[in-house]
Amino acid sequence: MNITKAELVISAVKPEQYPDSGRPEVALAGRSNVGKSSFINKMINRKNLARTSSKPGKTQTLNFYLINDSFYFVDVPGYGFARVSKQERQKWGKMMETYFTTRETLKAALLLVDLRHPPTKDDVMMYEFFKHYEIPVIVIATKADKVPRGKQQKHAKIARETLRLAAGDSLILFSSETGQGKEEAWAALLPFLTE
């Protein structure tokens, strides 16, 4: 995929702020600090369009990135150990649920999990949520460069088993450092962007 243009269009907190262009959208979900911003930057060959942070829970809005004027990456708030109040977390949860269950232009979701560790309960719940609402899901196992090559498949197998990955759902090993998995991720995404 040749990316010629990428821009952050809006950081939205409520549905009336979502773009209404009708372009297809792919949501990125995952724990705080799993590497969603780094994933976006690597996929579109930019250093810092999506701002990365060492402080978990930085993304508190739905960030709509318009790519090539043709589709959106939507970065949703990270779940897990974001340092916010329970009330804030519930507010985010509601915002995410509203987006995932009512957004007609949402074509697929990318669930990012950390390849170094088995998926968390939150990861499993998120995967089951997507399956329940029949949102096509592609699992991206990030930080693959931190796992020795010889052990990557073993870690991938643990991830598949923990998530109880459905037949036909992809799990792609990805590294924003080396670019491993980038072509594969685009290949998995393209069918949803060209419907």
Swiss-Prot record:
Any one GO MF annotation of this record: metal ion binding
Coiled coil: none
An annotated GO cellular component: cytosol
Residues binding Mg(2+), per UniProt: S37, T59
Gene3D superfamilies: P-loop containing nucleotide triphosphate hydrolases
GO biological process: division septum assembly
Binding site residues for GTP: 30-37, 57-61, 75-78, 142-145, 174-176
Domain named EngB-type G: residues: 22-195
Pfam families per UniProt: MMR_HSR1
InterPro entries: G_ENGB_dom, GTP-bd, GTP-bd_ribosome_bio_YsxC, P-loop_NTPase
SUPFAM superfamilies: P-loop containing nucleoside triphosphate hydrolases
Keyword flag Transmembrane helix: no
Co-factor requirement: Mg(2+)
Domain of life: Bacteria
Keywords, sorted A to Z: Cell cycle, Cell division, GTP-binding, Magnesium, Metal-binding, Nucleotide-binding, Septation
The keyword Cell division is annotated on this UniProt entry: yes
Task of the protein: Necessary for normal cell division and for the maintenance of normal septation.
Family named by the database record: Belongs to the TRAFAC class TrmE-Era-EngA-EngB-Septin-like GTPase superfamily. EngB GTPase family.
Protein name: Probable GTP-binding protein EngB
Native source organism of the sequence: Geobacillus thermodenitrificans (strain NG80-2)
